[in-house]
Amino acid sequence: MKTVHSASYEILRRHGLTTVFGNPGSNELPFLKDFPEDFRYILGLHEGAVVGMADGFALASGCPAFVNLHAAAGTGNGMGALTNAWYSHSPLVITAGQQVRSMIGVEAMLANVDAGQLPKPLVKWSHEPACAQDVPRALSQAIQTASLPPRAPVYLSIPYDDWAQPAPAGVEHLAARQV
């Protein structure tokens, strides 16, 4: 059975987002598990540098860039560079790891208390899927939203236990969407 993890990587692959810019922490490890051989990971030592590299990559290539940040702390660290990306109209698809679903709302260590609000107003769209099965659709929507005029960064908070969950039936059409 296809997992949220494998379905999400297929969506990224089909949209050409095979370069991942990041500075991972524990919340991002399930996403990075079984990292595809046809993807490359650009490691930055600080989230500001990571977002800055992705911003430059998107501007130089004319294509969206994919960023994976560490929870709320990493998102906060990347906000200065996110400001530049916002004003440059860079199509960044930014994901951040979130605490496991059962810990959201109890202010556990590494939980982003109000994930959808944290990066605003520096993103065009910010979202945390309501359930694991909604992650592939939300990722597809993030890519589409970042890519459509006016291009701009988007943000998606993903609880780290979502990656191992079964993907919903019929997610294949999400990878085939074109802007």
What are these regions (language model features)?
Residues M1-V179:
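N-terminal alpha/beta PP-like core and its mobile active-site loop of ThDP/TPP-dependent enzymes
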